[in-house]
């Protein structure tokens, strides 16, 4: 990997993350590498400025923070093919980050990158767009929205807790009409987040699939479903004349869905690329440790396993 121009995004409002980002930027600049540095958070989005002001291809994005910081970076940078190197600095759960122990902004780290001493983990992204008219109308009326974890269609009203009726089609075929709090379309990466909280399936990130999970459906027969990755999920809001139904990308508001509109959700053309330094990184170990599965807190001796 060449290191000529590097993005450093840190968790907005977190002094630990900012201090680590400043140290990292100083180390890179001392090697003649052009650095673009900025905070990322609910009120800070540096990525459009980074992309617009780049004078040459961006080789790497270093993300210092928690999962929310990583999700924002993936949404904005994956379509440009910029790899992400993420560390849990100032974050909480850190499901999508490497431990801070691996963040040592010294010559050894940069030498590893230059010598390609890392693994590349590709994670599916989702793309969503709004459409009007019949299902045969494939021309979008909105920009394309991206998500690493999930796209969620659910209502949001300022003065009441709303339920909604959503019709879901897969590749033009009606699957169900859900009455409840909403619908989640998730990648395998996102299956351990909102989908898991809604009692949906946990899908290994090495599996190419989409998971569709209703949120608090009023019918006990409305169940989660796992579908092929090339499927197009179309969601139509029904039974309302107000634009209270919203599209959410990784928990961030994307847009309102007006009556008569539908949202099409599919696998994005380009995945997010994560650089992995931990040679012992294991999805199953992350499940045990981050989700506190019983294996992490209950220890029985298995004398049958060699």
From Swiss-Prot:
It comes from the Bacteria. It is found in: Cytoplasm. GO terms for biological process: NAD metabolic process; NADP biosynthetic process. It catalyses: NAD(+) + ATP = ADP + NADP(+) + H(+). Its main location: cytoplasm. InterPro entries: ATP-NAD_kinase_N, ATP-NAD_kinase_PpnK-typ_C, NAD/diacylglycerol_kinase_sf, NADK. Its cofactor is a divalent metal cation. The active site is at residue 67. Involved in the regulation of the intracellular balance of NAD and NADP, and is a key enzyme in the biosynthesis of NADP. Catalyzes specifically the phosphorylation on 2'-hydroxyl of the adenosine moiety of NAD to yield NADP. Belongs to the NAD kinase family. This is NAD kinase 1. It comes from Synechococcus sp. (strain ATCC 27144 / PCC 6301 / SAUG 1402/1).
């Amino acid at each position: 990997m060449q290191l000529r121009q590097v993005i450093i995004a840190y968790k907005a409002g977190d002094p630990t993350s900012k201090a680590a980002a400043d140290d990292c930027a100083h180390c890179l600049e001392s090697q003649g590498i052009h650095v673009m540095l900025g905070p990322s958070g609910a009120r800070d989005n540096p990525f459009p400025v980074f992309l617009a002001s780049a004078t040459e291809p961006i080789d790497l994005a270093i993300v210092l923070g928690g999962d929310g910081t990583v999700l924002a970076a993936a949404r904005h940078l994956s379509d440009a093919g910029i790899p992400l190197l993420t560390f849990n600095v100032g974050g909480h759960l850190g499901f999508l980050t490497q431990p801070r122990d691996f963040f040592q902004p010294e010559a050894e780290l940069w030498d590893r990158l230059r010598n390609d001493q890392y693994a590349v983990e590709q994670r599916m992204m989702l793309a969503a767009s709004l459409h009007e008219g019949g299902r045969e109308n494939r021309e979008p009326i909105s920009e394309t929205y991206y998500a690493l974890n999930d796209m969620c269609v659910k209502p949001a009203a300022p003065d009441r807790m709303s339920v909604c009726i959503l019709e879901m089609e897969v590749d033009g075929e009606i699957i169900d009409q859900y009455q409840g709090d909403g619908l989640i379309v998730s990648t395998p990466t996102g299956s351990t987040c909102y989908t898991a909280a809604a009692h949906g399936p946990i899908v290994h990130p090495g599996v190419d699939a989409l998971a569709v999970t209703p949120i608090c459906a009023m019918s006990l027969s409305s169940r989660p479903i796992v579908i092929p990755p090339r499927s197009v999920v179309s969601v139509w809001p029904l039974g309302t004349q107000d634009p209270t139904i919203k599209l959410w990308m990784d928990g961030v508001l994307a847009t309102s869905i007006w009556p008569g509109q539908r949202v099409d959700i599919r696998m994005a053309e380009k995945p997010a690329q994560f650089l992995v330094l931990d040679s012992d990184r294991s999805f199953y170990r992350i499940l045990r440790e981050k989700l506190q599965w019983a294996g992490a807190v209950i220890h029985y001796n298995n004398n049958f396993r060699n």
